[in-house]
Amino acid sequence: MIAPTRRFMWVVALGILPPAALGAFFPPFAALAILATVLIIAGAIYDAATNLKWWTGLTLTFPKTIRLTSRIEGDLTCTVEDTRKRKLNLRIGFTSAPGLGLKQDILEARLTPEKSAILKSWKCCPYRRGRIVIEHAYLETDSRLKLWHVRGRMPVACEIKVYPNLGSDRKSASAAFLNRGRVGEKSIRQIGKGREFEMLREYMHGDSYEDIHWRATAKRRSPVTKVFQIERTQEVYVIVDSSRLSARRPGGYTRDREIAEEVLPEQESLLERYITAAMLLHQVAHHQGDLFGLLVFDDRVKNFVRARGGKAHYSACAEALYTLQPNMVTPDFEELFSFIRLRLRKRALLIFLTNLDDPVIAESFSKHVEMISRQHLVMINVITPKGVEPLFGKTEVNDLDDIYLQLAYHFQWEQIRDLEKSLKTSGVHLQQLTNERACADIISQYMQVKQKQML
């Protein structure tokens, strides 16, 4: 593909138009005008024909995979090399995907016979997590006579993975990441003794009779006591709801039923908060010595990662979450609980990140949760919209419309409270979260379970 340059425009304006005007008024000069026009057209055709395959010998190499973090500036690098060692002034670009946040769309690269390869990079600040694939890059340079911009397209293979940004939420829960014995650690008092058997030892004065191992005592003919330790390597599963309600923003509604924009950036939703909380909880569970698992569902189970530990497992969970998008369907809790009942045989802590403010969805959840509540410890976390609180709780009322709005918020708050009481009879714990403190409160909930040895 070619496009005329500014020089070509000037050549046409000064080399064709004046002779043509002169030939129109003075017929003897018509031959001169025709000759100038033919020469300019022939030169332009020659210049274009000699640059049809100008990109032959050029190679453009991108990394196969580039990993970036949302809202953190990074580099997208490529290597340009000319095996024919020509002097070229290149302009390089590619089709930018939404959310990549390129600082500059087109880069300029100058190749010379002495420097036939060069490394260039685009500055970018992605603001949306997900997977971006670059399949083609576009090159442009000037022809030999500089009458044309000659362009070409080259196939490339580059995958950009943008992961969630955990920075601000990690700071709010930083105490959970401190190792035992370090200065500044937030100490958590353990309630009760451990329940996991560690070893046998000889009876000592003051040991409880209930800890005596009677079979070993009879065999050795002297009292033997069982020693217990705090439970380790327990299984913790985060269950993420990616159905239609997770696409909402947690900012609440204004009087005109528009979502408040000052609470979160435009691209964030409830699902973004769920993903951030899940990845942070994985790190905390790893520091506590527990095994972390992940389950994603909407109207079916979309992804299941069995509880394990280690860096490779964290990468597997991150790969399962970074491309997750809301699906406009209603969640099927019956299928979800049947899947959990069949796959999770060992007692585990199940932390649900879902939405139950829809009465139909809440009824379906309450109806089927007993399938797993007797075997597992179930914790439900819902992020309530801004303003959902008891009637005339904190928000000021200025006119009649505010009264109706607060009344609607009160009905929604009362519905969640009734659901919380109903689920408590089945041994299920429901916790209402605010958007700003969601990640920190979920981690605190997990630490309390560890402290009280509820699992």
Region annotations inferred by a language model:
Residues 1-59:
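Extracellular/lumenal glycan-associated context and N-glycosylation machinery
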Residues 304-332:
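Short, charged loop segments at secondary-structure junctions
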Residues 315-317, 387-417:
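Acidic, Ser/Thr-rich peripheral helices and adjacent loops at domain boundaries
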Residues 268-270, 324-328, 351, 356-360, ...:
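Short, contiguous acidic/charged loop-to-helix segments that flank catalytic cores in large enzymes
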Residues 331-384, 452:
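Exposed acidic/Ser/Thr-rich ligand/metal-binding surfaces
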Residues 38-312, 347-352, 367, 371:
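An amphipathic, basic-hydrophobic helix/alpha-beta surface used to engage anionic
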Residues 300, 383-388:
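Short beta-alpha junction loops
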Residues 394-395, 414-455:
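Long, C-terminal catalytic modules of enzymes
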